[in-house]
């Protein structure tokens, strides 16, 4: 008997223009458009294997080796149902000889190679990998934008992980959500020297989940309404132009402004929401001072911080300046050196140690033992990948190879 199985991986994306707030909570339709950078899967990714079999008695999912119940009406169930519907409409209805996989239950195993729910977008890469593996299993002849419509219903930001490079999630205007989808602004090959330095400030679960937090903001923040109407549309256009022109200075300015406003909107929520902590704020001070020196010398910024709904910093920087940024973080957070894999060989045979650029005012922040737990250096990357059987997460019987 045939085995119907496929494995795919999907990347993390980090927004430069933030998504925060839904106009429809069931379909996950956003109050504003957003734009993100896809990070390289060689460093951060979710991998998912999906199998369909007539002998399976129910749909089942394991996340990082632990079974996760697929609750009726949940986002997970919605995504699986929608993918089965696409299989029927796009394949089985058109080709009567195609196996009726849409009628089989599925078993799905998913694994993240980074901490889940820690301010790194695990739900985005997770739902993108889920949809991509089911699309491969079902042999769907559809575009990433079409798949993004389904991934969006799992986790809004997941729709942006269906492409590599620079990706916009267009908010759309239709009530059914059919125009709220992801489009690629530029592929990863357009700006290959753009790198990202992730400072892992805290890998514990956060206090206020994004889902709960953003709806409280929609209900109570007047600043969010100003942001939606007057700020985001202009920023979306400006940052898209900056990306097309590879204008790092403009890209950095807009990215930092939008991160600041997102956290201002969280603070404007009643009661207020705090995602950044004192370590996060210290990193902002370091990047502001680093850019002050850069502007004095060259007239342009050289780094951009951004924070999602958590304390971790993501710092965008051109490849030639990455070492200065890592040096800076290690100068103020020396413990981070223990959890920094130097995958790009910045230090070659040198010892990893902190330093600041000349002209830097070291009084802008205090040294902080244990403040940054680790540093991840990565770069811009591609969209979902279909993987071979040797990377499958399910064994011959259709159960996870690794259980927690």
Where do the model's predicted regions map?
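ATP-binding N-lobe of GHMP and related small-molecule kinases
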Residues: 1-118, 132-144, 371-404
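C-terminal nucleotide
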Residues: 2-15, 21-25, 29, 57, ...
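Short beta-strand scaffold segments in enzyme catalytic cores
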Residues: 15-18, 46-50, 158-161, 165-170, ...
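Short capping/connector residues at structural and topological boundaries
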Residues: 24-25, 40-44, 119, 125, ...
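Short amphipathic alpha-helical segments
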Residues: 68-75, 126, 143, 275, ...
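Charged/polar, low-hydrophobicity segments characteristic of intrinsically disordered regions
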Residues: 78, 82, 159-171, 230-234, ...
């Amino acid at each position: 008997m045939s085995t119907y199985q496929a494995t795919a991986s999907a990347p993390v994306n980090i927004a430069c223009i933030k998504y925060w707030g839904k106009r429809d909570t069931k379909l996950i339709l956003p109050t504003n458009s957003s734009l993100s950078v896809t990070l390289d899967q060689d460093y951060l990714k979710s991998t998912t294997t999906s199998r369909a079999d007539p002998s399976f008695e129910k749909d089942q999912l394991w996340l990082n080796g632990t079974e996760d119940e697929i609750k009726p009406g949940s986002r997970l169930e919605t995504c699986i149902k929608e993918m089965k519907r696409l299989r029927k409409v796009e394949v089985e209805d058109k080709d009567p000889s195609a196996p009726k996989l849409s009628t089989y239950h599925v078993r799905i195993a998913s694994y993240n190679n980074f901490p889940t729910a820690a301010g790194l977008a695990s739900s985005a890469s997770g739902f993108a990998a889920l949809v991509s593996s089911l699309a491969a299993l079902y042999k769907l002849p559809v575009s990433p934008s079409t798949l993004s419509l389904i991934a969006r219903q799992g986790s809004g930001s997941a729709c942006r992980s269906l492409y590599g490079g620079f990706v916009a999630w267009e908010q759309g205007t239709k009530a059914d959500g059919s125009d709220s989808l992801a489009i690629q602004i530029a592929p990863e090959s357009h700006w290959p020297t753009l790198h990202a330095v992730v400072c892992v400030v805290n890998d514990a679960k956060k206090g206020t989940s994004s889902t709960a937090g953003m709806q409280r903001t929609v209900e109570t923040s007047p600043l969010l309404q100003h942001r939606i109407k007057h700020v985001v549309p202009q920023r979306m256009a400006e940052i898209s132009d900056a990306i097309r022109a590879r204008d790092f200075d403009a890209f950095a300015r807009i990215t930092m402004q939008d991160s600041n406003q997102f956290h201002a909107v969280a603070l404007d929520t009643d009661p207020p929401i705090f995602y950044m902590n004192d370590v996060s704020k210290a990193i902002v001070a370091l990047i502001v001072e680093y850019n002050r020196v850069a502007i004095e010398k060259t007239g342009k910024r050289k780094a951009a911080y951004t924070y999602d709904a958590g304390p971790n910093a993501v710092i965008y920087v051109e490849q030639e300046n990455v070492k200065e940024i890592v040096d800076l973080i290690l100068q103020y957070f020396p413990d981070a050196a223990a959890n920094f894999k130097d995958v790009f060989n910045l230090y070659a045979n040198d010892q990893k140690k902190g330093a600041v650029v000349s002209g830097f005012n070291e009084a802008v922040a205090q040294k902080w033992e244990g403040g940054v737990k680790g540093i991840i250096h990565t770069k811009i990357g591609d969209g979902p990948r279909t993987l071979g059987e040797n990377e499958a997460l399910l064994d011959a019987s259709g159960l996870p190879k690794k259980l927690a």
